[in-house]
Amino acid sequence: MSDKTPRKPTAFRLEQPARVSAASEQEEPRRPRAVKDLEQITPQADVFDLTDDEAAELEILDPAFEAPERKGWSLSRILFGALGILVSFAIGIWTEDLIRALFARADWLGWTALGVAMVALAAFAAIILRELVALRRLASVQHLRKDAADAAERDDMAAARKAVDALRTIAAGIPETAKGRQLLDSLTDDIIDGRDLIRLAETEILRPLDREARTLVLNASKRVSIVTAISPRALVDIGYVIFESTRLIRRLSQLYGGRPGTLGFIKFARRVIAHLAVTGTIAMGDSVIQQLVGHGLASRLSAKLGEGVVNGLMTARIGIAAMDVVRPFPFNAEKRPGIGDFIGDLARLNSDRNARK
């Protein structure tokens, strides 16, 4: 029992808290009124966006490159080979006569000429060796393209591993492929299909190089387009296209690890000359431009700017052909670039330049 006396029951009233009406919290509705001068923004279509028909016409200009297979000796090879042998004999006889004549005058002159001739011969042999190595490297890239395409088509795992190992060897000296090669090494044992291995190697190793190659082709095309638009003579256009195309092919070859020598570069020159022939015919006038790139686009550009766009497109086509030649793997997992990828940038570039004038 507790010593405290329990409290007697008493009655008390609980105070109710003030209720806030939900209706009072709402703001007074705005009275309806008419809004005048309502600004409307209508999106405008880009005038340089290609329609499906124009894109199809441009893709016709850009067929996939197929390296022709030449077997045996052609008449041109026999001719230049025979002329090369005759020139070599002539240089040898002239050098021998010169050294004999110098020995007849003074012994030290003869020995000096003989030493210089030996140095020149050693340098010539080194150049020939370097060119042969470059040609062999170029031929190995061509064979690797065929082997990779064949392995992907037949889904041959052994052939795919061999092709990927060759690709690793080519890309070993390219810093941009280090991350892709590391990832490929970690995933190679987990892949059981040859086609998937080829696609993975193309994606991880060649994708960064493809991205850089697209940038090189686009920048070269822009430079050609600008020079064509401002040059007063067609001869200047052709000369600059030759210079820019030559530099573009060499830079793409170095990018993909091909590094062709002088003799290897001559093989590319035939395709460049063919493209330049097309470029020269395009410079005739706006009617040919309309036939090539569509009436819609040509009507939006002046004649000179249109020639700049088309010359830029031909440079882009040369760059795409060079990518087909020097790329170790054919385009399978990655999308092959086309002329339509560059037309918008070239047209906008010339349009902006025309607007600033």
Swiss-Prot record:
UniProt KW keywords: Cell inner membrane, Cell membrane, Membrane, Transmembrane, Transmembrane helix
Region (Disordered): 1-36
UniProt main location, coarse: membrane
Keyword field contains Transmembrane: yes
Record membrane topology: Multi-pass membrane protein
Pfam families with a match to the protein in the record: DUF697 (PF05128)
Membrane-spanning segments: 78-98, 109-129
Compartments where found: Cell inner membrane
Residue ranges, compositional bias (Basic and acidic residues): 27-36
InterPro entries: DUF697, UPF0283
GO CC annotation terms, alphabetical: plasma membrane
Family from the record: Belongs to the UPF0283 family.
PANTHER family xrefs: UPF0283 MEMBRANE PROTEIN YCJF
NCBIfam families given in the database record: hyp_HI0043
Identification of the protein by name: UPF0283 membrane protein BAbS19_I09770
